[in-house]
Amino acid sequence: MSVSMAAGQLADFRRCSTAEEYFILLDVDYDPRVLAVNRLHILRYFANQLVELHDTRTEAGNPVELLREYRDALIRSYEAFTTASALDHRLFKVLQDRAPQSSFVPASSITVERLTPTVPQPSAPSDPVEPSQSAWPHHAAASADYLGGTR
């Protein structure tokens, strides 16, 4: 690819507005299902990769080389979400705020409390319940007897 052609492609890159446009322009294969589910996460990851790339660069560089680095960054971004989930990367604040907390308990903080066994005391025998009486009467006559009323 010539430098002038790459410069034109860089101008097109700056006008991209969808994830698909980036993938097509940089000639990166993708599964539309993966992109549909992880679109925002891939684009955020890609943006972070580009910031890192530009922070480490000291000069503008050759447009051909820059496009190659952009392509590599997009491939890394896409592959990051084919091998792990959005929850694994936690790129967005809402996911960072809900990050799992550590559940570590040091062994030194565990104590054992030994209880002395108690022997149950025998209880007084209860009054036998007549078969016609029950704790939950099932009809109105039994209910009146149970509540102390008359039939």
Swiss-Prot record:
Keywords: Nitrogen fixation. GO terms for biological process: nitrogen fixation. It comes from Frankia casuarinae (strain DSM 45818 / CECT 9043 / HFP020203 / CcI3). Pfam families: NifW. May protect the nitrogenase Fe-Mo protein from oxidative damage. The lineage of its organism: Bacteria, Bacillati, Actinomycetota, Actinomycetes, Frankiales. The keyword Phosphoprotein does not apply. It comes from the Bacteria. Homotrimer; associates with NifD. InterPro entries: NifW. Signal peptide: none annotated. This is Nitrogenase-stabilizing/protective protein NifW. The keyword GTP-binding does not apply. Belongs to the NifW family. Residues 115-151 are annotated as: Disordered.
